[in-house]
From Swiss-Prot:
InterPro entries: Cell_div_suppressor_YneA, LysM_dom, LysM_dom_sf. It comes from the Bacteria. One of its GO terms (biological process) is division septum assembly. Its main location: cytoplasm. This is Cell division suppressor protein YneA. Inhibits cell division during the SOS response. Affects a later stage of the cell division protein assembly, after the assembly of the Z ring, by probably suppressing recruitment of FtsL and/or DivIC to the division machinery. CDD domains: LysM. GO terms for cellular component: cytoplasm. It is found in: Cytoplasm. Keywords: Cell cycle, Cell division, Cytoplasm, DNA damage, DNA repair, Septation, SOS response. Residues 35-86 form the LysM domain. Belongs to the YneA family. The gene is yneA. The keyword Endoplasmic reticulum does not apply.
Length: 101
C-alpha cells in the first residue's frame, strides 16, 4: 500500500514537471524584447549565429531553430532586405551589436 502511494506521488510529480515544461516551451516570445535586424545580401542563419554568438550564447543549431520558429520562416533561407528577430535581448546589446531597426 505504501509503495503504491509513493509511486502515485512520484508519477504525479513527474507529470506536473513535464506539463510545466510544455507550457513554458510553448509560451510566445515577446519580439519587442529582442533585436531586429535587416538581412544583408549573403547573410545566412549560420553566419548570423556565429556573428552574434557572444550575445546569445546558444549553439548555432538552436539559434537557427529559434529564428525560424519565432519569425515563422518557411525555411532557414534568408532573403536580402528581410527583417528578422534574433535571440539577442535589446537590454544586453550594449555597444557591441550592430542593430538595423
Amino acid at each position: 500500500m505504501r509503495k503504491t502511494l509513493l509511486h502515485y506521488v512520484l508519477f504525479s510529480f513527474l507529470f506536473a514537471l513535464v506539463l510545466a515544461g510544455f507550457v513554458y516551451a510553448s509560451s510566445p516570445v515577446d519580439k519587442k524584447e529582442y533585436v531586429t535586424i535587416t538581412v544583408a545580401p549573403g547573410d545566412t542563419l549560420w553566419g548570423l549565429a556565429k556573428q552574434y554568438e557572444q550575445e546569445h550564447h546558444m549553439p548555432p543549431d538552436e539559434f537557427i531553430r529559434w529564428v525560424v520558429d519565432v519569425n515563422h520562416l518557411p525555411s532557414p533561407r534568408l532573403a536580402a532586405g528581410e527583417q528578422i528577430v534574433i535571440p539577442v535581448l535589446k537590454s544586453k546589446q550594449g555597444g557591441s551589436v550592430a542593430v538595423n531597426q
